[in-house]
Structures are given as structure tokens and as C-alpha cells.
Amino acid sequence: MTDVETTYADFIASGRTGRRNAIHDILVSSASGNSNELALKLAGLDINKTEGEEDAQRSSTEQSGEAQGEAAKSES
């Protein structure tokens, strides 16, 4: 019973009067950032690789593919 009493005392001390105030708290905390900031951050992301990076990735992939092919031949 003491757990319930402590929870009740904490609820009374918080100043909330029910669920209707909880939604307001959630909306206020999520409104700190706006969509303009998000759009700018997303625009700053660079998902395109430069030509040098693509060539390096292709050559390493081709080399690993050749090594796997040779290993498969030696196992047979």
C-alpha cells in the first residue's frame, strides 16, 4: 500500500490534474526543432560518392570476387 501512496503523492506534487496535461507536455517537448532545420540537415548529407571512391570500391569488389572464384575452383 505504501507504493500506491508514494505514487499518489508524486502525482499530486507534479501539478498535473490528469491525462489532458500529458499530451500538452509531449507536444511542447517535440516542438523544439522545426521542419526547416530538419530539411537543412538532410540537404547537408552527401550520399553520392565521388568517382575516385566508386573506382576504389569496384576494384576491391572485383578482387574479392576473383579470390572467391579461385577458392571455389581449388575446392572442387
UniProtKB/Swiss-Prot annotation:
Sites marked Important for inhibition: 16, 19-20
Function: Extremely potent competitive inhibitor of cAMP-dependent protein kinase activity, this protein interacts with the catalytic subunit of the enzyme after the cAMP-induced dissociation of its regulatory chains.
GO cellular component: cytoplasm; nucleus
Name of this protein: cAMP-dependent protein kinase inhibitor alpha
Additional remarks: The inhibitory site contains regions very similar to the hinge regions (sites that directly interact with the enzyme active site) and 'pseudosubstrate site' of the regulatory chains; but, unlike these chains, PKI does not contain cAMP-binding sites. The arginine residues within the inhibitory site are essential for inhibition and recognition of the enzyme active site.
GO molecular function, one term: cAMP-dependent protein kinase inhibitor activity
Species annotation: Homo sapiens
Gene coding for it: PKIA
Domain of life: Eukaryota
